[in-house]
Amino acid sequence: MLDRRQLMTGVVASLFGSLVLPRRSAAAQQTGLLALTDRLSLVTSGGTNVLAFASPDGLVLVDSGAPDRSDALMTSLRALAPDVRARTLFNTHWHAENTGANQIFRQNGAAIVAHENTRLWMATPTWMPDEDRYRPPRTKEAQPDKTFYADGAMTAGNERIEYGYLIEAHTSGDIYVFFRDSNVLAVGDVASPARDPELDYLTGAWIGGRVDAMDRLLKLADANTRIVPGFGPVMTRAQLQVERDVMKTIYDRTVDRVREGDYVEDMLKAGVMNGLARTWKDPKKFLHDLHKGLWAHHNKLDANVV
């Protein structure tokens, strides 16, 4: 996955809603743990966000961090469960920085749950254009062993956990995981509050899919829902709404231009990225990926695509 980070700017504070999110204490910064409820914690020591739910039957995790941060992740998790025994690990998508410790957890008995497309991408050599190479398949032990296509649910420690498919938003295998009773919604990289949104067009993502996925998330959430992205701070529903509206504005500004033959420089000159409620570190990269994704879904652009 490409590590293109940037800061959200220009969003008026009143849009952030009334939900007060917990601040990271010095202890939280040291341990990499941020308590969201008495049983649910955000773990940041893995390089990307890992959500950990402590149940009597073992931990339920959402994502497993970056490959080079596994030791730090395990150290943090021991504060929640000394034996770091995981019952279930959800993968929100296939990218290595979010699934780096998969093999460790599966070898220790965890079931890895993901969309079937995520398993397929992990099992397949994948072209990495920024690195000019193919990424080899992941080991069998690192791949999900329980996959689904639409949605599902489970219970852990009296907590209802719902999960479902988010079609072609960041990859072709994105899912959400909703801790219903705790009102905490993990969305992977379908939300991107702290770096450039990535449209991994090579594995199926496009901006129309991202808008649709965010609309589904907004229907699940309420004003008190804490939304956990794959990287960056916990979000409110109001903040997710702002990001969704930015994506929809860009879609509206670009879909006709792409159909008519515009490329990145043309769209930048036309100001398609101007006046938005966030900035980009690399707008050219974002528009390049947007362009590729739109053409991959050209049948959805207009009946008269040439």
Please give the residue ranges for each predicted region.
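C-terminal segment of classical bacterial N-terminal signal peptides
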Residues: 18-24
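Divalent metal-coordination and catalytic microenvironments
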Residues: 39, 53, 63, 93, ...
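Active-site HxH/HxHxD metal-binding segment of metal-dependent hydrolases
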Residues: 79-153, 172
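C-terminal regulatory/interaction regions
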Residues: 264-306
